[in-house]
């Protein structure tokens, strides 16, 4: 790693951690709750408002249905929590819904679940941050005026926090999450005390407004459809529940028990806050409208485009605490902050799921590799990029983004619970112990009811939200599914192609002879080292090769070659069009054609430099040549490095990075146990791959040439 990128990376992300410190990043329950459950906990900041927005289509009279919708959401939440408690005990490895569906329903069902969850994680980041920006914008106008920019900045900051490691980010996120939860409970209790004990009349700032209903007097099927749509909007309170089942490996031992306890606590807190806010909204007469400028009426007139519609939780807090009071400001700040931090659920769930998918060869294997801070860095960056793109496309508008929401999570809910039913059926078929059978039958009953209820809700969500944006989420799921299927086919095809055969084939037969070719442009120390290394290989044939792009330089090279008496034949390739790469490629192919059973070893001298700008000052055409040679069967490419004096600076930087636990420290071992590097360049040649990334290479005959390949 270069000095230019190393120092900023260490400042932003921190020192690299050794693999044996992975246990130090595992989470206790008090930290796991805000890390994994911040999404469903924070959803009470916008889920009640989404319910009222849908009901407002039928006017204020439809608001009396909101408590019943809240009851339906509570029943659904408790059902899902009870179902997932069975999941974390049966599958503690962290695969969550993906592992359950794959094991019990097959690979296609598993991929469907994975696609749904990946889309939902991206939407979690986009929705949470967009909603947080809008809440913050009610106090700071600049934020609303630059929503997309501010949302993107928050995504970048969250990404950096998570790249430092889940435990550190969890500690930071715990404080505002607990302040938010505590503030909401204080608001609910104080509001209940004022209303029930003191008899105070609490009124929201919109209590005197009227709503211009789009459809008056809805009844029959139209009313049922409206209520179902409002219920599906309220189901946003359930998003993120599955993150705990995906993140079981991140918990401290006993992992399953701690995850199940955290899941139960999350469900209880979320439904209590959701119901409390719905009840206070009804008590304080909160009014919401999808188009407030035209649908909210004050004294019989539209309120106008200058009106900013505050979220339900903000209006309730103003009615309970009083506008501008300390508790009002504290809750408003905590609400905005916790909405930003709710995205952290996805920052933990997405990389973990991506790692499992990569291990199963459905995603690039780089997603399975942990970064310097023992986090799945590639998955974190991928999630951030996708969420930022979605935020820009939708203008950081939470109302539009929420229409895409929750489709994926209910797909995973339904398939996961269906898979758990099959899981218990399989175990009941072989289990003889009556106590264990009773426990399994109870778990099966819970998962059966969960599968039925979540499947029913999925149908409701698809029917009521398809034209409002759910089709975009479905399209994203299809794209993920097709991409992962193609990646798996590619990995399977490559594995089959490179598998070691039982019988010897041409690739395994020892070559009859090895013909070595040393590429040179002039006689200097790197050339002499490459020739010495080639002689050590004891090849059956050895020659030096140069390309004649400048007759004067070629003649000078021949003369010095003869004067020095170098005992290696010099082959000169003519190049009328001053090309370097093509003549060499054609010559090497000719050697292979003459003797197909022979192997050709192409040896290239290489400069090792210490500064990035030195790469620009040396001829790079040999690097292109090496890249072309990789596609020539039977040709081996070897780089012989020669360390220039400036490479000592790079060695000094490497020694300093050892004290910083630089990247690669995990593979090299503790800094104190690593062997000292020699202060002088090694006299022996080293071989490297054809990529030539360790330095600059000189192409044969290219010195001083401006010709293009």
Give residue ranges: language-model regions:
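Loop-to-transmembrane helix boundary motifs in multi-pass membrane proteins
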Residues: 107-110, 147-152, 250-273, 355-392, ...
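Hydrophobic alpha-helical segments and their helix-loop junctions in multi-pass secondary transporters
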Residues: 181-211, 278-287, 414-431, 486-495
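Extracellular loop-to-transmembrane helix junctions
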Residues: 51-102, 107-114, 127-154, 269-270
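C-terminal membrane-solvent junction of multi-pass transporters and transport-like membrane proteins
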Residues: 366-378, 413-458, 463-466, 497, ...
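Cytosolic C-terminal regulatory domains/tails of membrane transporters and channels
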Residues: 1-21, 492-682, 704-709
């Amino acid at each position: 790693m270069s000095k230019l990128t190393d120092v900023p990376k260490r400042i932003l992300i921190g020192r690299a951690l050794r693999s044996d410190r992975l246990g130090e990043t595992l989470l206790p329950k008090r930290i796991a709750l805000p890390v994994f459950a911040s999404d469903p906990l924070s959803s009470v900041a916008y889920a009640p408002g989404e319910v009222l927005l849908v009901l407002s289509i039928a006017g204020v009279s439809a608001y009396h249905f909101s408590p019943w919708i809240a009851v339906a959401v509570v029943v659904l939440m408790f059902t899902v929590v009870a179902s997932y408690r069975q999941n974390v005990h049966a599958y503690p490895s962290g695969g969550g819904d993906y592992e359950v569906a794959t094991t019990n329903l097959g690979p296609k069902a598993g991929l469907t679940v994975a696609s749904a969850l990946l889309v939902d994680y991206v939407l979690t980041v986009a929705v949470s941050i967009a909603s947080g920006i809008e809440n913050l914008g009610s106090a700071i106008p600049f934020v609303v005026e630059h929503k997309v920019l501010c949302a993107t900045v928050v995504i970048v900051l969250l990404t950096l926090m998570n790249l430092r490691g889940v435990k550190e980010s969890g500690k930071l996120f715990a404080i505002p999450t607990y302040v938010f939860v505590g503030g909401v409970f204080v608001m609910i209790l104080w509001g209940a005390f004022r209303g029930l004990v003191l008899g105070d009349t609490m009124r929201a700032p919109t209590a005197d407004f009227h709503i211009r209903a789009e459809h008056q007097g809805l009844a029959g099927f139209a009313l049922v459809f409206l209520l179902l749509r409002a219920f599906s909007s309220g189901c946003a309170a359930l998003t993120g529940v599955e993150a705990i089942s995906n993140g079981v490996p991140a918990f401290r031992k006993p992992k399953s028990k701690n995850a199940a306890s955290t899941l139960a606590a999350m469900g209880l807190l979320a439904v209590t806050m959701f119901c409390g806010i719905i009840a206070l909204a009804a008590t304080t007469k909160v009014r919401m409208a999808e188009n407030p400028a035209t649908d909210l009426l004050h004294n019989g007139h539209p309120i106008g485009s200058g009106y900013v519609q505050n979220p339900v939780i903000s209006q309730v807090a103003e009615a309970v605490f009083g506008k501008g009071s300390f508790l009002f400001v504290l809750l408003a700040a905590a609400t905005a902050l916790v909405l930003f931090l709710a995205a952290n659920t996805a920052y933990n769930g997405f990389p973990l799921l991506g790692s499992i998918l990569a291990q199963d060869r459905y995603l690039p294997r780089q997603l399975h590799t942990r970064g310097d801070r023992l986090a799945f860095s590639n998955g974190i960056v991928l999630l951030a990029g996708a969420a930022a793109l979605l935020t820009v496309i939708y203008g950081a508008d939470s109302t539009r983004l929420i229409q895409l929401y929750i489709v994926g999570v209910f797909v995973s809910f339904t398939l996961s619970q269906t898979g758990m039913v099959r899981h218990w059926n399989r175990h009941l078929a072989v289990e003889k112990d009556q106590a264990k059978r009773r426990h399994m039958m109870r778990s099966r009953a819970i998962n059966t009811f969960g599968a039925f209820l979540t499947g029913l809700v999925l149908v409701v969500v698809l029917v009521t939200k398809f034209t409002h944006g759910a089709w975009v989420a479905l399209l994203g799921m299809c794209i993920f599914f097709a991409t992962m299927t193609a990646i798996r086919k590619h990995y399977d095809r490559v594995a089959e192609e490179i598998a070691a055969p039982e019988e010897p084939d041409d690739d395994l037969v020892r070559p009859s002879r090895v013909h070595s070719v040393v590429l040179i442009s002039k006689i200097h120390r790197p050339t002499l080292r490459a020739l010495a290394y080639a002689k050590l290989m004891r090849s059956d044939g050895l020659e030096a090769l140069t390309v004649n792009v400048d007759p004067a330089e070629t003649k000078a090279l021949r003369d010095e070659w003869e004067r020095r008496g170098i005992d290696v034949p010099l082959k000169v390739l003519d190049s009328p069009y001053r090309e370097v790469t093509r003549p060499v490629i054609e010559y090497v192919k000719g050697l292979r054609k003459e003797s197909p059973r022979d192997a050709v070893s192409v040896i290239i001298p290489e400069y090792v430099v210490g500064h990035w700008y030195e790469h620009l000052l040396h001829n790079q055409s040999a690097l292109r040549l090496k890249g072309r040679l990789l596609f020539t069967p039977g040709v081996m490419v070897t780089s012989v490095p020669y360390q220039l004096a400036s490479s000592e600076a790079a060695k000094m930087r490497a020694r300093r990075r050892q004290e910083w636990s630089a990247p690669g420290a995990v593979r090299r071992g503790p800094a104190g146990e690593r062997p000292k590097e020699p202060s002088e360049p090694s006299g022996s040649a080293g071989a490297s791959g054809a990529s030539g990334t360790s330095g600059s290479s000189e192409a044969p005959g290219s010195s001083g040439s401006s010709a293009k390949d």
